[in-house]
């Protein structure tokens, strides 16, 4: 319940009570809360204090300045539409089929109460370790200091009604000409002001002290989650849509902020304040006042929890629609060129609108159920307040209570209204935060299919010999890629892997790099099974230029330096020269400071590939893997780049593997391995394979040779332009 408006009815009038009492006209206390507090639980929103920094929740101390009857009202606010998608996400990749279903980020399914309670407590226990770490006395000191300030603030807050009571009783006497306010109630007024100021001061100090504790916990959990995701295998990332994944992580980290602040600064202090008020009412005015208060608190809390549990289903549905909307929007924006190329803007908008409709439907349910919750809370508290005023009025009539006592009762009850109102909001947000964090912690609990074995040792390279021994692998059980693949790549030699599309050429690298693990067989490097060595040492020993070049939304200098973050600028420049991309970079307006755009969309495919080559040359690993590294280059640039690469490899003893469709680029390889239907169909040098009429390699070579004799569209266009230039010169001469 929030109090946003009040009626200006005076509680007392002259002559209505014994003695001479001046008319007290109450001033409306305007409390402006944000839409999150008024609306209760707008989707995706948090209490305003939490968004500023954890540990700061709306103040309890600044309550009502004068006695008044308040008509309570709460503004309804429909949940906001889904947050705009962040277009800087990594592109989603069509998932490979998997026998193990991925952990869903959809939180719309109801969870059994007992199971959910266990999950909630396990989440809280994990967070407790972050706010009370074993080997960090500084954090413990801050937590103790924050709790001390909290208790001190609550004790002072309860004193405010007592000062108010004393002021009213002091003024309820005959007024003479010599009487002044300071004579009658000066000390009480000063105490009233001091108590309110100190309550606010202690609250702000508490927030400042606890802020670093909460932020440190958030940073630690967020870092652990991000690190865990980076350590997951490729199958995990291919099966998940980036938009929904990042949205779930974002909500989970925000949930940490709310839970830490709400438990420490709302749940505990609210219970403390209710206990203190019930004790004071019982001690000062009897059990009936305390009984009404206790019953009201229990009924209010029970109603809020039950109603919120019913409304949680709608929140889950809205979250599921929000995740889906983010995924659809990110996919569409990332694939902007495809959308425009096929004129499918209306289709993409319709897809996004479908998710918005689902979100809208769930949001309407949230808003309408919120009205029922607000009405019930208002009725319960208003009924209790009426009963308390009735008991107080009877006490005044009987002479057992003074006017100040009535003021005291009224103020104590109203002081409970704020924590109770926030308790409802906190409970609603607490439940949602636990749901969001459950999804995030489930991500942390997933195991990677490819990870170091307990006995893994660093890879010791001797020459770089690679052997596939009876390897079987399939992305999907019904479509095996390799059945019994065996071949050996000699150390220090240039080896090419060729074959028809879909024969598994790129899969060789994915298995070697342990993006995936083979289902059977062994992959050896210098006689060491790659499953028995550490992933870090394995991947540091291999450099790759992938078929689809991944670039960051940063400048060219950073994208090349990513191969070796410790490299100097001069080393980066040298790698660019070796990759035959230095001239292109120098022609750009900002040269190495030029931004390449998201996924490198602001530069050509050939430039992206040359940057990737420069990056791997900067890494300078003993084993190099080129997966269609020159497919986007013109013949001249390709020839120059391959000449540079060959010169780098010459005499350095590096093992290099080239996957290529253009067979002329690998005709000088020491060994060519031809794959077909999951097996090694042929292997040998270029000359040996051509000497095998009817062979796979011979057929591929003849097909490309025939194709190369036909003029390309670019060559036809160039010839046409040359003819036009000749014709123009003839016209000028005539």
Curated annotation (Swiss-Prot):
PROSITE patterns: ABC_TM1F, ABC_TRANSPORTER_1, ABC_TRANSPORTER_2. Residues 56-142, 211-259, 306-371, 428-734 are mitochondrial matrix. GO terms for molecular function: ABC-type transporter activity; ATP binding; ATP hydrolysis activity; ATPase-coupled transmembrane transporter activity. SUPFAM superfamilies: ABC transporter transmembrane region, P-loop containing nucleoside triphosphate hydrolases. Residues 466-702 form the ABC transporter domain. It is found in: Mitochondrion inner membrane. It holds the Pfam family ABC_tran. InterPro entries: AAA+_ATPase, ABC1_TM_dom, ABC1_TM_sf, ABC_transporter-like_ATP-bd, ABC_transporter-like_CS, P-loop_NTPase, Type_1_exporter. Residues 1-55 form a transit peptide. SMART domains: AAA. Residues 165-186, 284, 391-405 are mitochondrial intermembrane. Residues 93-114 have a biased composition (Polar residues). GO terms for biological process: intracellular iron ion homeostasis; transmembrane transport. Residues 143-432 form the ABC transmembrane type-1 domain. Its EC number is 7.-.-.-. Keywords: ATP-binding, Membrane, Mitochondrion, Mitochondrion inner membrane, Nucleotide-binding, Transit peptide, Translocase, Transmembrane, Transmembrane helix, Transport. Performs an essential function in the generation of cytoplasmic iron-sulfur proteins by mediating the ATP-dependent export of Fe/S cluster precursors synthesized by NFS1 and other mitochondrial proteins. Hydrolyzes ATP. Binds glutathione and may function by transporting a glutathione-conjugated iron-sulfur compound. Homodimer. This is Iron-sulfur clusters transporter ATM1, mitochondrial. It comes from Cryptococcus neoformans var. neoformans serotype D (strain JEC21 / ATCC MYA-565). The gene is ATM1.
């Amino acid at each position: 319940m929030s109090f946003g408006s009040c009626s200006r009815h005076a509680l007392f009038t002259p002559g209505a009570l014994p003695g001479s009492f001046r008319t007290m006209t109450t001033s409306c206390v305007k409390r402006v809360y944000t839409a999150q507090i008024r609306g209760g639980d707008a989707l995706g929103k948090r209490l305003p204090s939490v968004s500023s920094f954890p540990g700061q929740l709306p103040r309890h101390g600044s309550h009502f300045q004068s006695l008044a009857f308040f008509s309570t009202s709460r503004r309804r606010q429909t949940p906001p539409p889904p947050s705009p998608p962040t277009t800087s996400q990594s592109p989603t990749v069509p998932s490979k089929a998997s026998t193990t279903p991925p952990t869903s980020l959809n939180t719309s399914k109801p969870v059994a109460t007992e199971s959910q309670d266990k999950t909630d407590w396990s989440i809280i226990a994990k967070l407790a370790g972050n706010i009370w770490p074993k080997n960090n006395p500084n954090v413990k000191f801050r937590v103790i200091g924050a709790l001390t300030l909290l208790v001190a603030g609550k004790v002072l807050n309860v004193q405010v009604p007592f000062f108010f009571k004393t002021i009213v009783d002091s003024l309820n006497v005959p007024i003479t000409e010599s009487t002044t306010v300071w004579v009658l109630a000066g000390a009480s007024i000063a105490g009233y002001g001091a108590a309110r100021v100190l309550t606010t001061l202690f609250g702000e100090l508490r927030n400042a002290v606890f802020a670093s504790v909460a932020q440190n916990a958030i940073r630690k959990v967020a870092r652990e989650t991000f690190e865990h995701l980076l350590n997951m295998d490729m199958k995990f990332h291919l099966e998940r849509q980036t938009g929904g994944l990042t949205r779930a992580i974002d909500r989970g980290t925000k949930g940490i902020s709310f839970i830490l602040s709400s438990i420490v600064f709302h749940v505990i202090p609210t219970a403390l304040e209710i206990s203190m008020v019930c004790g004071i009412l019982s001690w000062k005015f009897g059990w009936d006042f305390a009984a009404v208060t206790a019953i009201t608190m229990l009924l209010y809390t029970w109603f809020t929890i039950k109603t919120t549990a019913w409304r949680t289903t709608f929140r889950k549905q809205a979250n599921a629609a929000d995740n889906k909307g983010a995924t659809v929007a990110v996919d569409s924006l990332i694939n902007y060129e495809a959308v425009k190329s096929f004129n499918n803007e209306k289709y993409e908008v319709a897809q996004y609108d479908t998710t918005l409709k689902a979100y809208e439907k769930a949001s309407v349910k949230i808003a309408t159920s919120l009205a029922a919750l607000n009405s019930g809370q208002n009725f319960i508290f208003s009924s209790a307040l009426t009963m308390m005023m009735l008991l107080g009025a009877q006490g005044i009539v009987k002479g057992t209570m003074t006017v100040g006592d009535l003021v005291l009762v009224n103020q104590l009850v109203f002081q409970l209204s704020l924590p109770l109102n926030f308790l409802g909001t906190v409970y609603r947000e607490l439940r949602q935060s636990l749901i969001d964090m459950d999804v995030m912690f489930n991500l942390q609990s997933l195991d990677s299919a490819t990870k170091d074995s307990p006995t893994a040792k660093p890879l010791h390279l001797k020459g770089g010999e690679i052997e596939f021994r009876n390897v079987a692998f399939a992305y999907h059980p019904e479509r095996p890629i390799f059945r019994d693949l065996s071949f050996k790549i000699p150390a220090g030699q240039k080896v090419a892997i060729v074959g028809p599309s879909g024969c598994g050429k790129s899969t060789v690298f994915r298995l070697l790099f342990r993006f995936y693990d083979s289902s059977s067989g062994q992959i050896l490097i210098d006689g060491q099974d790659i499953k028995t060595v550490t992933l870090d040492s394995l991947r540091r020993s291999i450099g790759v230029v992938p078929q689809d070049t991944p670039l960051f939304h940063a400048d060219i200098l950073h994208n090349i330096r990513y191969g070796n973050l410790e490299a100097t600028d001069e080393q980066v420049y040298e790698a660019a020269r070796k990759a035959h991309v230095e001239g292109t970079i120098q022609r750009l307006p900002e040269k190495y400071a030029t931004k390449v755009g998201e996924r490198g969309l602001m530069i050509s495919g050939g430039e992206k590939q040359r940057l990737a080559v420069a990056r791997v040359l900067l890494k300078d690993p003993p084993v190099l893997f080129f997966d269609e590294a020159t497919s986007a280059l013109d013949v001249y640039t390709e020839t120059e780049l391959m000449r540079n690469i060959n010169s780098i490899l010459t005499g350095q003893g590096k093992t290099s593997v080239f996957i290529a469709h253009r067979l002329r680029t690998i005709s000088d390889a020491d060994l060519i391995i031809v794959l077909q239907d999951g097996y090694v169909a042929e292997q040998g040098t270029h000359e040996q394979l051509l000497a095998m009429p009817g062979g796979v390699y011979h057929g591929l070579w003849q097909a490309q040779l025939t194709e190369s004799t036909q003029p390309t569209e670019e060559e036809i266009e160039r010839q046409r332009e040359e003819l036009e230039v000749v014709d123009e010169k003839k016209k000028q001469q005539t």
